[in-house]
Amino acid sequence: LCADGPACLAAEPLARRLGTTKGSFYWHFKDVPAYHAALVRQWHAQALADVMTQLEADGASAARLRSFGHRIINTPSEAALRVWAQSNASVAVSIAEVDAERLTYLQSLLNGFGLRNPAFSHAILASLIGLPQMHTGTDQHAAFDALVDTVLALA
């Protein structure tokens, strides 16, 4: 998905890439939509588990905020899934659910700094979605940290 986009998520390209047969693919999955559903379920579960891990983490809120952002930036499948979601409604629904949880988590962190305006959490999440889409040679972690510094300076 990351290298070749959603078109590579069909039985034949997957079998070719893995050096196996289409029959092997169909042994594991009823059909291509079932494979897609399993792939999205796995990402969804992992993304929500990451939010829960951050919720349960110890440490200063600023460090937790940075860690949360860096984990998203470091997930290459995130950007690829968002591209896929533009043409696949079930992927879009899954991403929207994860984004809602992420916004709730971000807002809870920002509330701790006295920043109650939900636009801040939306701006932070938007930067996490957009930074990996940029191909300018920008240090994405440094750019995210600069945004966090700016938002926290308002507290």
PLM feature spans:
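Short amphipathic alpha-helical interface segments enriched in basic and hydrophobic/aromatic residues
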Residues: 2, 6, 48, 52, ...
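Helix-turn-helix
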Residues: 2-34, 38
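Residue-level recognition of oxygen-bearing side chains
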Residues: 31-34, 60, 90
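Hydrophobic alpha-helical connector segments
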Residues: 38, 49-80, 120, 124
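Short, basic, alpha-helical segments at the C-terminal edge of helix-turn-helix-like DNA-binding modules
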Residues: 41-47
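Amphipathic alpha-helical packing segments from all-alpha helical-bundle domains
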Residues: 48, 74-80, 89-122
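Acidic, metal/ion-handling microdomains and their immediate structural contexts
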Residues: 85-86
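Hydrophobic/aromatic-rich alpha-helical bundle segments in the mid-to-C-terminal region
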Residues: 92-96, 111-155
